[in-house]
């Protein structure tokens, strides 16, 4: 399957900062509930992320992440996930977050 640059432009991927993280015991697979500040234009949004192997809730607070903000909300158990926090698999298939390598303003759009 191929994609064009125009396809990529349809994705609204923004920098956010995790403001709150807590275990999500109702999820089918181990996960956290996340609250992500995406700046004044978008505000704070909720997400669910299966990132429990490499991160604790305490590790996540204040961490910058990349998130897709223009997918429709998705019901995950009792949580309505509003953004998709992005990650890649490590050698064992566990999620590692994609993050800016320097602190940048929240809400910035990836291009």
Give the ranges of each region predicted by the language model.
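Phosphate-backbone binding interfaces of nucleic-acid-interacting proteins
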Residues: 1-111
